[in-house]
Amino acid sequence: AYLGAENIFPSLIAMDRKGFSFTPHQDRELHIKIDKGDFVLEPEWHYMVYRPVESDRGLDPDSDLFSPGYFYSMLKGGESEEVLASISGLKDQASLSPAALPQETRPFAIDGGSGLKMDEALCRALDRFIVKRGELKSVIAGYPWFLDWGRDSLIFVRGLVAAGKIKDSMEILQQFGRFEKNGTIPNMICGKDAANRDTSDAPLWFCTACSDLIQAAGNENFLDSKCGTRSIRKIIFSIGKFMIEGTPNGIRMDPQSGLIFSPAHFTWMDTNYPACTPREGYPIEIQALWFAALALLNRIDPLGKEGGWKEIYKQVQASILDLFILRKEGYLADCLSASSGVPAGQAEQDDALRPNQLFAVTMGAVRDTAVCRNIVTACEELLVPGAIRSLADRPVRRPLEIAYHDKILVDPNQPYQGRYKGDEDTERKPAYHNGTAWTWLFPAFCEAWVKVYGEGGKDTALSWLGSSRRLLSQGCAGQIPEILDGDFPHIQRGCDAQAWGISELLRVWKQVFSI
């Protein structure tokens, strides 16, 4: 403001009776127009406006705001008004009307009047995250902050496959497949830099996404498509081989149990500095994904020419039941905690109730009916409307110590944090995976529910999934936020639009609806 912007901005406004254009630069134009009402030009500059969201995130909450004027419209009962906006497009303001807009950008509503059906709304939302990277496609993990992350992109592909977007799915898998090296896949891609490979689940999600794709296609042709100098099939074999022998970054199969050791902060619960959910050892969802990968490997290499997949497959399934069940509670430990080199049989069970065990049901790694029921019954405690909490609000037997500059941030014996707000290192990070509710994992609960209860559980699962309508209609309309507070009233937090939140909701919605 003190450089003169408050004096310059009013001169950058061009108006007519229905709206205005704001052009701060020749390549940047904002057009806003009202349908029935009028625009009143009345420029105002407000100094040091307090913004509560920035304050909640521990950022500078005060900044100046500029308003060019206001819209005025007289409405009778039952009437509605539309305000339409575009950025650097639709330069002819006369064309800025509902009829002139592409179908996918017209006003949004869900299951109400002329609104969209749930699956239509979710399919539309998927396209917002697909981007070009070179000759292939990639996925923006979330707006406004994230880029293309390996784990998120590969989970997102499952929703694309469910939506019938097979070509896009293939190109994304080829994009990440070409980066596979010694059983690892990038955690994220920054320009041409794919050096960050601190993820034990991204290679396994790659296998799961490939399995979904060939299942939907009804053939294995995609596995023979070229990805650089190799085929997708060879890349999957490479992942299986190095999971067993060990990757350069420390992921390795325990030969005694067949389970996969994951270094600290290599799962989706990867918050670090301070270490909030290290999960070093044998995390349950990694074992479920490994089980599913072995099923795929056995399918595409039934004679075991590339490895003894079938024997390890049986070993993993038996080891999960033998080592993960908490005898007192009847559901699964979140992780068998151990340092590198310690066999799973000597690891310590982490009794924290988290939703990761749901993948043991959805991936088919646990099929014992009683255990599966115990899992979904326990995880029901974690549900909030449209999301599932990352940790139960209850004491834990195995303490979780979160320290920052020699200061303990939360009670190690009850680490649940129900509000995601405040300073990043001392407040938000400890809460991120320790009570914050996540949208992407919520559909997995509903998927597990129908796995356990079959057709009889369909209506209940659809009712739970339907609680996401509120999220689609609030915040970033037509999208699903990244996270919510674990505590009531479950305020939306994090990214306003999260790729895997949309894709998983669509995938499971279609799956459950088809039962």
Q: What is each model feature region?
A:
Residues 1-515:
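Acidic, mature catalytic/reactive cores of soluble proteins
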